[in-house]
Protein backbone atom coordinates (compact mmCIF):
# COMPACT_ATOMS: atom_id res chain seq x y z
CA UNK A 1 0.00 0.00 0.00
CA UNK A 2 1.06 3.58 -0.59
CA UNK A 3 3.56 5.05 1.82
CA UNK A 4 4.76 1.73 3.25
CA UNK A 5 8.32 2.37 2.12
CA UNK A 6 8.52 5.69 3.94
CA UNK A 7 9.61 6.26 7.49
CA UNK A 8 6.59 5.30 9.52
CA UNK A 9 6.06 4.26 13.06
CA UNK A 10 2.31 4.47 12.81
CA UNK A 11 -0.13 1.60 13.26
CA UNK A 12 -1.19 0.04 9.98
CA UNK A 13 -4.62 -1.41 9.26
CA UNK A 14 -4.87 -4.85 10.79
CA UNK A 15 -7.62 -7.32 11.62
CA UNK A 16 -6.17 -7.98 15.09
CA UNK A 17 -6.64 -5.66 18.04
CA UNK A 18 -2.89 -5.07 18.39
CA UNK A 19 -1.48 -2.25 16.23
CA UNK A 20 1.29 -3.40 13.88
CA UNK A 21 4.24 -1.26 12.95
CA UNK A 22 6.03 -1.12 9.65
CA UNK A 23 9.82 -1.24 9.47
CA UNK A 24 11.44 2.20 9.48
CA UNK A 25 13.66 2.79 6.46
CA UNK A 26 17.26 3.67 7.41
CA UNK A 27 18.33 7.20 6.59
CA UNK A 28 20.22 7.13 3.31
CA UNK A 29 23.75 8.50 3.26
CA UNK A 30 25.73 9.88 0.35
CA UNK A 31 29.50 9.50 0.17
CA UNK A 32 31.62 10.91 -2.63
CA UNK A 33 35.14 9.86 -3.52
CA UNK A 34 37.79 11.07 -5.96
CA UNK A 35 38.96 8.25 -8.21
CA UNK A 36 41.47 8.21 -11.05
CA UNK A 37 40.01 7.75 -14.52
CA UNK A 38 41.66 4.33 -15.01
CA UNK A 39 40.02 3.04 -11.80
CA UNK A 40 36.69 4.53 -12.96
CA UNK A 41 36.95 2.45 -16.15
CA UNK A 42 37.63 -0.71 -14.10
CA UNK A 43 34.69 0.01 -11.77
CA UNK A 44 32.30 0.66 -14.68
CA UNK A 45 33.42 -2.30 -16.81
CA UNK A 46 32.38 -3.18 -20.36
CA UNK A 47 28.87 -1.82 -21.03
CA UNK A 48 28.53 -0.99 -17.32
CA UNK A 49 28.64 -4.65 -16.30
CA UNK A 50 30.90 -4.17 -13.26
CA UNK A 51 29.12 -1.13 -11.82
CA UNK A 52 25.74 -2.87 -12.27
CA UNK A 53 27.07 -5.95 -10.45
CA UNK A 54 28.25 -3.77 -7.53
CA UNK A 55 24.85 -2.00 -7.47
CA UNK A 56 23.01 -5.32 -7.33
CA UNK A 57 25.24 -6.93 -4.69
CA UNK A 58 25.34 -3.90 -2.37
CA UNK A 59 21.88 -2.35 -2.96
CA UNK A 60 23.65 1.03 -3.09
CA UNK A 61 23.28 3.60 -5.85
CA UNK A 62 26.56 4.35 -7.66
CA UNK A 63 27.27 7.15 -10.09
CA UNK A 64 30.56 8.21 -11.68
CA UNK A 65 30.95 11.73 -13.10
CA UNK A 66 31.82 12.26 -16.74
CA UNK A 67 35.49 12.26 -17.69
CA UNK A 68 37.01 15.73 -18.15
CA UNK A 69 40.04 15.68 -20.48
CA UNK A 70 42.07 18.11 -18.34
CA UNK A 71 41.33 16.29 -15.06
CA UNK A 72 42.78 12.84 -14.26
CA UNK A 73 40.09 12.23 -11.61
CA UNK A 74 36.37 11.63 -11.55
CA UNK A 75 33.83 11.76 -8.73
CA UNK A 76 32.28 8.50 -7.56
CA UNK A 77 29.02 9.03 -5.66
CA UNK A 78 27.70 6.12 -3.58
CA UNK A 79 24.38 6.46 -1.78
CA UNK A 80 21.99 4.28 0.16
CA UNK A 81 21.76 2.76 3.62
CA UNK A 82 25.03 2.82 5.59
CA UNK A 83 25.63 -0.94 5.28
CA UNK A 84 24.92 -0.83 1.52
CA UNK A 85 27.37 2.04 0.99
CA UNK A 86 30.03 0.30 3.12
CA UNK A 87 29.57 -2.93 1.18
CA UNK A 88 29.76 -1.05 -2.14
CA UNK A 89 33.14 0.45 -1.23
CA UNK A 90 34.44 -3.00 -0.24
CA UNK A 91 33.26 -4.38 -3.60
CA UNK A 92 34.81 -1.42 -5.44
CA UNK A 93 38.21 -2.20 -3.86
CA UNK A 94 37.82 -5.87 -4.83
CA UNK A 95 37.01 -4.83 -8.40
CA UNK A 96 40.07 -2.52 -8.58
CA UNK A 97 42.35 -5.25 -7.14
CA UNK A 98 40.70 -7.95 -9.28
CA UNK A 99 39.83 -10.09 -6.23
CA UNK A 100 36.77 -12.35 -5.98
CA UNK A 101 33.74 -10.71 -4.34
CA UNK A 102 32.88 -13.71 -2.18
CA UNK A 103 36.19 -14.43 -0.43
CA UNK A 104 37.78 -12.66 2.55
CA UNK A 105 40.79 -10.42 1.99
CA UNK A 106 44.01 -12.41 2.37
CA UNK A 107 47.32 -11.32 3.95
CA UNK A 108 48.68 -10.83 0.42
CA UNK A 109 45.70 -8.75 -0.75
CA UNK A 110 46.62 -5.44 -2.32
CA UNK A 111 45.81 -2.34 -0.30
CA UNK A 112 44.00 0.45 -2.11
CA UNK A 113 43.52 4.08 -1.11
CA UNK A 114 40.00 5.47 -1.41
CA UNK A 115 39.89 9.28 -1.23
CA UNK A 116 36.56 10.35 0.27
CA UNK A 117 35.32 13.92 -0.09
CA UNK A 118 34.08 15.06 3.33
CA UNK A 119 32.52 18.45 4.18
CA UNK A 120 34.92 20.38 6.42
CA UNK A 121 32.07 20.82 8.93
CA UNK A 122 31.82 17.01 9.34
CA UNK A 123 35.56 16.26 9.53
CA UNK A 124 35.68 16.97 13.28
CA UNK A 125 33.17 14.21 13.98
CA UNK A 126 35.24 11.79 11.86
CA UNK A 127 38.51 12.67 13.60
CA UNK A 128 37.13 13.00 17.14
CA UNK A 129 38.69 14.79 20.09
CA UNK A 130 42.49 14.53 19.77
CA UNK A 131 42.03 11.95 17.01
CA UNK A 132 40.21 9.42 19.20
CA UNK A 133 37.47 8.58 16.66
CA UNK A 134 39.86 8.15 13.73
CA UNK A 135 42.06 5.87 15.89
CA UNK A 136 39.00 3.78 16.86
CA UNK A 137 38.05 3.36 13.19
CA UNK A 138 41.63 2.38 12.30
CA UNK A 139 41.82 -0.18 15.11
CA UNK A 140 38.40 -1.68 14.34
CA UNK A 141 39.00 -1.91 10.58
CA UNK A 142 42.72 -2.39 10.07
CA UNK A 143 42.60 0.43 7.51
CA UNK A 144 44.76 3.54 7.71
CA UNK A 145 42.86 6.85 7.71
CA UNK A 146 44.38 10.22 6.93
CA UNK A 147 42.40 13.46 7.10
CA UNK A 148 43.59 16.14 4.68
CA UNK A 149 44.77 19.31 6.40
CA UNK A 150 43.50 21.75 3.77
CA UNK A 151 40.24 22.20 1.93
CA UNK A 152 39.98 21.31 -1.73
CA UNK A 153 40.48 24.32 -4.03
CA UNK A 154 37.33 26.43 -4.27
CA UNK A 155 35.35 24.25 -1.85
CA UNK A 156 34.52 23.68 1.81
CA UNK A 157 35.46 20.01 1.63
CA UNK A 158 38.52 17.99 2.58
CA UNK A 159 39.89 14.60 1.59
CA UNK A 160 39.73 11.65 3.97
CA UNK A 161 42.01 8.92 2.63
CA UNK A 162 41.26 5.33 3.63
CA UNK A 163 44.00 2.83 2.78
CA UNK A 164 43.48 -0.87 3.23
CA UNK A 165 42.45 -4.19 1.74
CA UNK A 166 38.81 -4.61 0.66
CA UNK A 167 37.53 -5.91 4.02
CA UNK A 168 39.27 -3.09 5.93
CA UNK A 169 37.79 -0.40 3.66
CA UNK A 170 34.34 -2.01 4.00
CA UNK A 171 34.58 -1.90 7.83
CA UNK A 172 36.02 1.63 7.95
Regions picked out by a protein language model, each given a short descriptive name:
Residues 1-42, 50-121, 139-144, 148-172:
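Low-complexity, intrinsically disordered regulatory regions of RNA-binding proteins
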Residues 126, 130-136, 141, 148:
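Long, charge-patterned amphipathic alpha-helical coiled-coil/hairpin "stalk" segments used as oligomerization
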Amino acid sequence: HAGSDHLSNFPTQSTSQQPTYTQAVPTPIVIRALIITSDASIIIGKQGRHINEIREMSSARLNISESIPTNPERILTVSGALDAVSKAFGLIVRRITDEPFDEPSLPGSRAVTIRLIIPNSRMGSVIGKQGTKIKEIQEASGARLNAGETMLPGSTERILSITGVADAVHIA
